[in-house]
């Protein structure tokens, strides 16, 4: 077909036929229902007494009034539904369809073999595969006849769409209206005759061909195509409509049964087209002579044994044959870029040439084209069959088996400046993931295996270090004794030390938590008195860090250091007690000079001595003690407390000078005890606490007396 014939065929009218409604299929929506009585009544009313249309309805794209592409040539109510036959006559629309069909891969595949290729018809069959009727919404005859005026027009137009909302509305395109009606087996001969009479009579009422009714453009058609992509289950509906109408029993251009995956697989078709173009370029024209490089006539080669030909089938594509070569050209020119192709010229020779000494079966073996995919076993079988021809063609030649080449030898190891060998990354990877032993440096061992013996040039490694200690807390706490450290055995170095520190052994961690909870209890808080700087704050008592395990073998030195620290505290406390005892003695001496007696003060204690052991010089003792007690009284009234033992020493010396009878007697006679009680009561009544510090001091003295 020439170019002019193709263009004239492209602008020729295209007929489309199909059902607008099926009476045996109930629609999903009530507004789409078209009963048979209503349809026949509308046809009689609009056809002026005839069951057909008197005025041609417009035919558009997706109910777009600006995209009118033709008219409805016939419409008739048949046994199964309302049938329609339309005619596409818009030149602009047909030209757009022709240009778009040239870019479509689905259209390039062509129709079924008995049909003639027609790109315009195939494009319309794939893009607008459904028919849709625009009519009034009526459910019965009474509602249809109740309207008046312009609303009495039952049908408005018929649209070409991607898929119809009513079931069974599949569109069939063709160049001949008679051929289109024959695609539907549900139409009887009488139905076809009535449709034929309508389209022949509708020629005078068709749209004027001089004025193109299509006022849209390619952008509007592209927008409609995008909308069609979002139709849910479009292909299953088209397949159902195709089976319902019965188009599957006859050949047509309908693409409803073609899946998108099969439509996009055009590799075989492109290989077929490329093979045809190569064969046409290699085959000389009729009457042309092939030039020869040698003056001698060419020798006709013997015909090789050819494999049996495959039966012709539209689904089987012929394999691409290599380009034919002239007899003067060498056979190596047709070899493929394969490692074994240079050694197997018989397998790569063209089908029309043979090699001397080769068997017919081997000489007929040809490499397939790139579009054929072979399994691995079949590929190596072909290589094995071609390898048998190598000794025949080249005596003494040995074909290499298709096995993996041996691994290259590793690079030698060179000693570095510090004496250790330089090892590459490949050697390290081989040691970890393969059975590789470096002959130059056997000191490296594989992971998860015991290391081999060291090189004799290396010195003997030192023995393992003994058990060491590791601190539990940060290194900042240097004042903590070694008893708070954790001991790690040298034999367990293979395990992680952090595992021991952070809960590796559950018993040790539990004991640490219990010790911390016991130390944080409120019962261990020390006492504080009002007026002190730390009153109201919880103060912890000093505790000795005793080994929780009960053992004392490794903590003897630490306990000794702790005992020394606590001995110093005990000495300080004892010194304070001696000072307080001296203060009480001075207050006792001061009370002897006071004549009045009162009740004993709660802050003083009486010293019990035998009453029968009284000295003869008892009258001189208060007088002798009064001179030393005057200074103490003055200091007591001034709020000064002497925290030393001088008063007790002075009183003892004065008592010694008073007479020999008092030096050998008891430390406190009965008169002195009574006088001390009276003096303390008078001092307590006469000198009240001056400030809070004095009050706290007296309370602290009373507390120490209770402890004693």
Curated annotation (Swiss-Prot):
Where do Low complexity bias regions lie?
284-293, 326-339, 593-611
Residue ranges of the motif Nuclear localization signal 2: 537-543
* Result of altering residue 229 to R: 1800-fold reduced catalytic efficiency
Q: Where is this motif: Nuclear localization signal 1?
A: 510-515
Segments forming a coiled coil: none
Phenotype when changing residue 227 to N: 1300-fold reduced catalytic efficiency
Q: What is known of its domains?
A: Region of interaction between pPR and pAP is called Amino conserved domain (ACD). The region of interaction with major capsid protein is called carboxyl conserved domain (CCD).
What family does this chain come from, according to its entry?
A: Belongs to the herpesviridae capsid scaffolding protein family.
This one is known as: Capsid scaffolding protein
Gene source species: Human cytomegalovirus (strain AD169)
State the taxonomy lineage.
Answer: Viruses, Duplodnaviria, Heunggongvirae, Peploviricota, Herviviricetes
């Amino acid at each position: 077909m020439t170019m002019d014939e193709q263009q004239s065929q492209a602008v020729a009218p295209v007929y489309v036929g199909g059902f607008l409604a099926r009476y045996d299929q109930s629609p999903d929506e009530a507004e789409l229902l078209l009963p048979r009585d209503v349809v026949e009544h509308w046809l009689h009313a609009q056809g002026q007494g005839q069951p057909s249309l008197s005025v041609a309805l417009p035919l558009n794209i997706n109910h777009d009034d600006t995209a009118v592409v033709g008219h409805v040539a016939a419409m008739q109510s048949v046994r199964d539904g309302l049938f329609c036959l339309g005619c596409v006559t818009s030149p602009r629309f047909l030209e757009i369809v022709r240009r778009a069909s040239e870019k479509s891969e689905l259209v390039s595949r062509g129709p079924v073999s008995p049909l003639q290729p027609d790109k315009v018809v195939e494009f319309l069959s794939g893009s607008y595969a459904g028919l849709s009727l625009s009519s009034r919404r009526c459910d019965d005859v009474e509602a249809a006849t109740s309207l008046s005026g312009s609303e009495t027009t039952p049908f408005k137009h018929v649209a070409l769409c991607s898929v119809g909302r009513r079931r069974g509305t599949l569109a069939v395109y063709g160049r001949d209206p008679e051929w289109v009606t024959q695609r539907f087996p549900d139409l009887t001969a009488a139905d076809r005759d009535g449709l034929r009479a309508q389209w022949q009579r509708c020629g005078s009422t068709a749209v004027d061909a001089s004025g193109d009714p299509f006022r849209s453009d390619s952008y509007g058609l592209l927008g409609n195509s995008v909308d069609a992509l979002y139709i849910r289950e479009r292909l299953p509906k088209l397949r159902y409509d195709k089976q319902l109408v019965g188009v599957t029993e006859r050949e047509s251009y309908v693409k409803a049964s073609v899946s998108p995956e099969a439509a996009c697989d055009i590799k075989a078709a492109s290989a077929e087209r490329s093979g045809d173009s190569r064969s046409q370029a290699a085959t000389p024209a009729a009457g042309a002579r092939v030039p020869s490089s040698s003056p001698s006539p060419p020798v006709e080669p013997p015909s090789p044994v050819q494999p049996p030909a495959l039966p012709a089938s539209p689904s089987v594509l012929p394999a691409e044959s290599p380009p034919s070569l002239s007899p003067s050209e060498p056979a190596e020119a047709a070899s493929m870029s394969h490692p074994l192709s240079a050694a197997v010229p018989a397998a790569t020779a063209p089908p029309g040439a043979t090699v001397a000494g080769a068997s017919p079966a081997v000489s007929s073996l040809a490499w397939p084209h790139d579009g054929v995919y072979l399994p691995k076993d079949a590929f190596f079988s072909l290589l094995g069959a071609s390898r048998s021809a190598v000794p025949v063609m080249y005596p003494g030649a040995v074909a290499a088996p298709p096995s993996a080449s041996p691994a290259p030898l590793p690079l030698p190891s060179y000693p570095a400046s510090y004496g250790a060998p330089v090892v590459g990354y490949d050697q390290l990877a081989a040691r970890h993931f393969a059975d590789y032993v470096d002959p130059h440096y056997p000191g490296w061992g594989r992971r998860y295996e015991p290391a081999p013996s060291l090189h004799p040039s290396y010195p003997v490694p030192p023995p393992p270090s003994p058990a060491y200690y590791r601190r539990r807390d940060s290194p900042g706490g240097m004042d903590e004794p070694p008893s708070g450290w954790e001991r790690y055995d040298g034999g367990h170095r293979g395990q992680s030390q952090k595992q021991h520190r952070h809960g590796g052994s559950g018993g040790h961690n539990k004991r640490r938590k219990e010790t911390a909870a016991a130390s944080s209890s409120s019962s261990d808080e020390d006492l504080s008195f009002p007026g002190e700087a730390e009153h109201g704050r919880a103060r912890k008592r000093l505790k000795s860090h005793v080994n929780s395990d009960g053992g004392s073998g490794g903590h003897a030195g630490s306990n000794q250091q702790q005992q020394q620290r606590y001995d110093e505290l005990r000495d300080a406390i004892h010194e304070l007690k001696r000072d307080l005892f001296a203060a009480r003695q001075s207050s006792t001496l001061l009370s002897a000079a006071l004549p009045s007696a009162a009740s004993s003060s709660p802050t003083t204690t009486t010293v019990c001595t035998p009453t029968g052991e009284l000295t003869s010089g008892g009258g001189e003792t208060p007088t002798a003690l009064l001179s030393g007690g005057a200074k103490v009284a003055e200091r007591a009234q001034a709020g000064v407390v002497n925290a030393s033992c001088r008063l007790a020493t002075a009183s003892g010396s004065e008592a010694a000078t008073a007479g020999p009878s008092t030096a050998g007697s008891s430390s406190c006679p009965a008169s002195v005890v009574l006088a001390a009680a009276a003096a303390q009561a008078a001092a307590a009544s006469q000198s009240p606490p001056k400030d809070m510090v004095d009050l706290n001091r007296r309370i602290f003295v009373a507390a120490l007396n209770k402890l004693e």
